[in-house]
């Protein structure tokens, strides 16, 4: 199947070669053998290649003559009777009007690229083909267009029909007489820009060939690497299959030896059967390894086949020999792998027969022992395992008669079974021979088909190589001719453009001098008008500038105030952050640096200096506790104050302390109690005041909580004195910070309003 795919791919490639003009017929599947030598085939190949080359040259000349009328004229003048051939194939030559030396009111010469000429020339050619029904000519023109496109974007002369239309348009009266000469010059310049010199065309062709060479080398390297990897895996698989064959044969030989040596008894026989078991294990291991290697080899072969198919789809020039060689190596690897697999299968079949024979022998021995046990049940059981020499003097006459009688009956029975088996096996052998003949015939036909297919593929590959060589030679010749024609055409166009450039340059300079004189007078008039208007605008702008300066000065003052207000606000925010920041290692942070920053930023502001001077000195050096710290500390103070609630300022006896402590344990007042709007004398109680203060602290009102704590008396007030002092310091500092914040916000709002005004 692989060869069929390769043959079909090569046949399709051969049929589509030579731009569709020549069709290569594939070989017939049933070809008769001949007795002629290979010299006739070689001569036929040479003659066919010569015919292909001559036909390709003539066809290419006709196509290029159809494309370029000047080339047709030169060929008709050089080669005799060529005008008749061109007249039969292409028709009469189109009439070309000579280019005028000085076109009057006409546009510049338009140069068409290859793509534009193809677009313009496809329509009339297609219409003539539909009228005449000439299919080969259409295929030939398409192939010529492909070859010309491969030569690069070279300059080319338009088709005859297009030239005729252009000359007619040139002779018609020009309707665009009102266009300026500058537009004509720009069109001529843009047309000349589209021209490509021969050096650039040659460079592009060289670059394209270099790119194709790089792609072909890359493809060859990838194919070589894949083939090396596949061949390595295939070689390992073949080695594993051969090892499996050797293991199967070794096991069969050892098993045959063990079955043939039936007279051996005791430890030797046991050792012999242990050897058989070891050989069986080795056989299974080798067969499993061979199966795994075969699967891996099949995967690698499939990957290699996919790589070859991908290489065919890429259609890289010059890659056909590499692909053909890769296909040949792949086919050889597949054939070698099939042969070694067949060897393994044959060895396994032979081993299977030996195993069946062993099973039949063992079963026959068991049946024979059972028969002897049924005939002589009274004899000692140990004698049946002894040899004949040992049994000679131990059997009686009756035992011998019984054994002889049983042996005669057994011999008669075996003779009848043997005769029946011979007749049956004779029929089986005849059927097997017929089946074997059919199998041999089928195998022979398959081998012949494979050989023919391989031979056809080789012939087809040789034909493809020859066709590729001929096509490369034709393409090189065509490209050389195209380069020459493009160079001549470029020189002609360069001369024409130079003449047009001189004429247009003279007309442009004359018109330019007239326009310059007119523009000079107009410029003088407009410059005086602009000078007057400019003086008026300068005076107006100066007045506006004075107003802008005053506004900018006032704005700068407002900006400075806003900047100072912003710096004050930032410094106050830093002070607030320092008050709120605390940790377990450092519960208070000195505020001196933050306050000093405020004083420095607002050194000329008396209000700010007065507020910063009112901050307690201890806050500057040590810092203040945050509200969270005071809240946590309050709970400890609250607990101690409840314990000494009954102690007044005189500090009563130890018994009074004990009663106060007992009271704190027995009484369970609410820990938090919302304070009333007005306090009454009965509300001034240590427990209620502490509950009110706890409620205020939990709701963020530290100032009111401090007021309630300040109402405590006796020992409770003394216990809470330190906390009250810290709270008072925190509140004072916080109040000053809030005033500074409000002041900074007010100043910032004022400066913002001034800026908006």
Swiss-Prot record:
Gene name of the encoded protein: Immt
Role summary: Component of the MICOS complex, a large protein complex of the mitochondrial inner membrane that plays crucial roles in the maintenance of crista junctions, inner membrane architecture, and formation of contact sites to the outer membrane. Plays an important role in the maintenance of the MICOS complex stability and the mitochondrial cristae morphology.
Regions of this protein lying in the Mitochondrial matrix compartment: 34-45
Subcellular location: Mitochondrion inner membrane; Mitochondrion
Subunit-level organization: Component of the mitochondrial contact site and cristae organizing system (MICOS) complex, composed of at least MICOS10/MIC10, CHCHD3/MIC19, CHCHD6/MIC25, APOOL/MIC27, IMMT/MIC60, APOO/MIC23/MIC26 and MICOS13/MIC13. This complex was also known under the names MINOS or MitOS complex. The MICOS complex associates with mitochondrial outer membrane proteins SAMM50, MTX1 and MTX2 (together described as components of the mitochondrial outer membrane sorting assembly machinery (SAM) complex) and DNAJC11, mitochondrial inner membrane protein TMEM11 and with HSPA9.
InterPro entries in the record: MIC60
Compositionally biased tracts (Low complexity): 181-192
Keywords: Acetylation, Coiled coil, Membrane, Mitochondrion, Mitochondrion inner membrane, Phosphoprotein, Transit peptide, Transmembrane, Transmembrane helix
Region (Disordered): 164-199
Stored PANTHER family: MICOS COMPLEX SUBUNIT MIC60, MITOFILIN
Membrane-spanning ranges: 46-65
Identification of the protein by name: MICOS complex subunit Mic60
Transit peptide, residues from-to: 1-33
Origin species: Mus musculus (Mouse)
Source domain of life: Eukaryota
Pfam families: Mitofilin (PF09731)
Highest classification ranks of the organism: Eukaryota, Metazoa, Chordata, Craniata, Vertebrata
Record topology, Mitochondrial intermembrane segments: 66-757
UniProt family annotation: Belongs to the MICOS complex subunit Mic60 family.
PTM-bearing positions, type Phosphotyrosine: 506
Membrane topology: Single-pass membrane protein
Residues bearing the modification N6-acetyllysine: 210, 221, 450
GO CC field: MICOS complex; mitochondrial inner membrane; mitochondrial intermembrane space; mitochondrion; myelin sheath
Entry-annotated residues carrying Phosphoserine: 112-113, 222, 387, 389
Coiled-coil stretches noted in the UniProt entry, renumbered to this chain: 199-231, 279-317, 397-442
GO biological process terms held by the UniProt record: cristae formation; mitochondrial calcium ion homeostasis; neuron cellular homeostasis
